[in-house]
A protein has these predicted regions:
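Phosphate-binding site of ATP-dependent enzymes
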Residues: 153-231, 242-250
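Acidic di-acidic motifs
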Residues: 10, 316-318, 392-396
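Asp-based phosphoryl-transfer active-site loop
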Residues: 310-324
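ATP-dependent carboxylate activation and anion-phosphoryl transfer catalytic cores
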Residues: 70, 215-222, 226-311
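Conserved Lys-Pro-Asp/Glu-containing loop-to-beta segment of HAD-superfamily phosphomonoesterases
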Residues: 380-398, 403
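A conserved helix-loop-beta module that forms one wall/lid of the active-site cleft
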Residues: 88-158
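Substrate-recognition element of Asp-dependent hydrolases with the DxDx(T/V) motif
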Residues: 331-360
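ATP-binding N-terminal substructure of ATP-dependent carboxylate-amine bond-forming enzymes
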Residues: 1-98, 413-415
Length: 425
């Protein structure tokens, strides 16, 4: 039986990584929960809106009502604040929470608490309790409860420190060296099964948008073992380090949750969100990883909500299903998606050679189409479209214009196919 998993908040990069890691699993059915209008509206088939924010007094009651009404089995927190809330209220939440205990989560949520807890360790950067303790510049300030590099900045003078510092910040030594994220996984017995370092090559709004796998330094592995020995991690977690002037690693932060860029190692075979579920369900786990170099780079992509209903898809063959001698994989994605939704697909073409032979050569099954119609050059495609609940896809402007004018249905060029893709499917 599938277990129902509620990811909250559903619109963070962490949430999308959890969703991408679980969406093909036969073990789970995914639900999303959101407090805001965000990209989750385009990616979750089962999205529950209207959540209060996690610091709202009514949040717990709302969450429990959602859990009860939808028979949710597990809540997968996807933001540092929701991780802390779920760990602190685990006994009150009507489902299993996929986060470790509140002591570990509380220490990780506050950089001040993290540095105080590990103050005897040499990998902790030098910190200053007040601006008056700072003698040499530059130094670095960052929010006590921030995440990533958001709100953090280099301070080069006392006047700049006085202008920017308040009690919500921690003051640290400036670390000029390279920055790394270290992805880790701890099983249900507290054993560190996975520890891999990666380079944060490009960062945007505190999120690593280009990251590269690399060999894990022994010093980094030692830090991981010491963190794992003193805190109670369960499943996936990560920490970030940076080198000081002497080339020594210093801890920047540690988090007990899924890293937002976990997709890097997911694509070497290590599915952190799924493995974490197995650990929380009490299953023994092991890890198999493909040994190759891999780089992850990401940017904004577009998802569309298009206001049309249709049951029929008419599309051309040349320069639509194929581009030169290659199959257009993006169009085929749409074709299979339409077929899965029960749309009736008609191939309407003026193909000059044997279309059946060419479909076979391209590896495209004729079973995808309800009908295959090959027209003479002199015939009009608009004469063959009778339904009004249809769309027409063709690279020819002249053909699209005639169909639009005569049939009054939406028409699409090949570059518009992306607007027809349903990312919830």
């Amino acid at each position: 039986m599938q277990k129902k998993i509620l990811i909250f908040p559903a619109g963070t990069e962490i949430a999308f990584e959890i969703q991408n890691s679980l969406k093909y699993s036969k073990f789970v059915k995914i639900y999303g929960g959101t407090s805001a209008s965000d990209h989750s509206e385009f990616t979750y088939e089962n999205l529950i809106t209207g959540f209060p924010f996690v610091d709202d007094a009514n949040f717990l009651d709302f969450l429990n009502n959602v859990i009860d009404e939808n028979e949710i089995d597990c809540v997968y927190p996807a933001h540092d604040s929701s991780c802390l809330f779920c760990s602190e209220h685990a006994d009150e939440i009507h489902a299993q929470v996929i986060i470790t205990d509140k002591t570990t989560t509380g220490i990780c949520r506050s950089k001040k608490k993290t540095y105080e807890f590990f103050q005897s360790e040499e990998f902790i950067p030098e910190t200053y309790a007040t601006p008056d303790e700072v003698i040499n510049f530059p130094v670095f300030i960052k929010p006590i409860t921030g995440q990533g590099s958001v709100g953090a900045r280099k301070i080069i003078s006392r006047s700049e420190l006085d202008m920017n510092y308040n009690s919500d910040y921690v003051i640290c030594e400036y670390l000029p060296g390279a920055e790394y994220t270290v992805d880790c996984f701890t099983d249900g017995n507290g054993e560190l099964l996975f520890c891999r370092q990666r380079m944060r090559e490009r960062i945007k709004t505190g999120i690593s948008v280009r990251t590269r796998s690399m060999d894990t330094d022994d010093a980094v592995r030692n830090i991981a073992n010491r963190l794992n020995g003193k805190l109670k991690f369960k499943g996936a977690w990560f920490f970030q380090v940076k080198k000081n002037l002497n080339g020594e690693y210093r801890l920047m932060e540690v988090s007990p949750r899924i890293p937002g860029t976990a997709g890097l190692y997911r694509n070497t075979g290590v599915n952190f969100p799924m493995l974490t579920l197995f650990v929380f369900w009490g299953y023994p786990v092991s890890i198999i990883e493909n040994d190759y170099d891999i780089v992850l780079d990401r940017a904004f992509y577009s998802a569309f909500r298009i206001g049309i209903d249709y049951d029929y898809v008419y599309l051309d063959y040349d320069d639509i299903l194929t581009l030169g001698d290659k199959v257009n994989a993006d169009v085929m994605r749409f074709v299979y998606q339409a077929r899965n939704k029960g749309k009736r697909i008609i191939l309407l073409s003026k193909h000059s050679t044997d279309i059946h032979a060419d479909l076979k050569k391209a590896g495209i099954s004729e079973e995808l189409f309800e009908d295959i119609q090959v027209l003479e050059k002199s015939e009009e495609k608009s004469d063959y479209i009778k339904e009004t609940d249809a769309i027409f896809i063709d690279d020819s402007f002249a053909e699209r214009k005639k169909v639009k004018e005569k049939c009054g249905i939406p028409v699409f060029d090949v570059d518009m196919i992306e607007s027809l893709i349903d990312w919830k499917s």
